[in-house]
């Protein structure tokens, strides 16, 4: 399953430092994370994005400008299917940016989207009329009730400077537990940065905002 990263800072930072650490996490993951990657960053009041079908550890991380908000995703495609750059996250509608990892089978909701993650993003958007956290809670509850089997469903959605997270998994706690480190820089990642201190684990079934 995929790897997720969000970094939000009070001051602009060089994203290459975070992307290098994230690339190392993806490369060393016990599950292959090389089906492409992407990132989005805040530029003024708008989102800019980049996606590439190559593994993140083979790409150039120095191409991106300084920013105060970064969202990144390294993809491990479900059953090695639908490997195409347009299926790489982050997904964005210009207002929200979305990343996901997990595995769901027998989902009974109807929504537009090329792959399951995009359908989940569009389903959450359906309920977001200003209360993004409330929309995330409602959508996750419905999806859980309308899905035959969920191995994991970790979601991060960023809107303006708000970061909204939902985490749920039914096994493999070490792999699916999300982690965060708060301070002048907020960092949320699928794994703790190598040789870094001060991270906290996010409990399963958390839905919260920063």
Describe each region flagged by the PLM.
Residues 2, 39, 87-104, 142-209:
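Conserved catalytic micro-motifs used in adenylation/nucleotidyl-transfer and phosphoryl/amide-
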Residues 105-163:
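Short histidine
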Residues 33-37, 65, 84, 149-151:
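Short, basic and Ser/Thr-rich N-terminal targeting/leader segments
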Residues 50-62, 72-94:
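Short acidic (Asp/Glu) patches
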């Amino acid at each position: 399953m995929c790897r997720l990263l969000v970094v939000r800072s009070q001051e602009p930072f060089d994203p290459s430092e975070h992307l290098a650490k994230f690339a190392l996490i993806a490369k060393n993951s016990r599950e292959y994370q090389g089906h492409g990657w992407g990132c989005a960053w805040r530029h003024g009041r708008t989102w800019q994005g980049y996606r590439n079908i190559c593994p993140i550890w083979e790409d150039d991380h120095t191409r991106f400008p300084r920013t105060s908000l970064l969202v990144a995703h390294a993809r491990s495609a479900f059953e090695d299917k639908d490997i195409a750059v347009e299926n790489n996250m982050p997904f964005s509608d210009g207002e929200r940016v979305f990343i996901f990892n997990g595995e769901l089978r027998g989902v009974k909701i109807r929504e537009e989207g090329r792959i399951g993650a995009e359908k989940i993003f569009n389903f959450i958007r359906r309920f977001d009329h200003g209360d993004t956290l409330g929309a995330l809670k409602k959508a996750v509850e419905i999806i859980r009730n309308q899905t035959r089997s969920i191995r994991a469903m970790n979601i991060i959605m960023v809107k303006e400077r708000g970061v909204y997270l939902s985490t749920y998994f039914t096994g493999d706690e070490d792999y699916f537990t999300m982690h965060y480190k708060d301070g002048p820089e907020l960092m949320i990642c699928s794994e703790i940065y190598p040789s870094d201190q001060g991270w906290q684990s996010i409990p399963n079934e958390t839905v919260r905002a920063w």
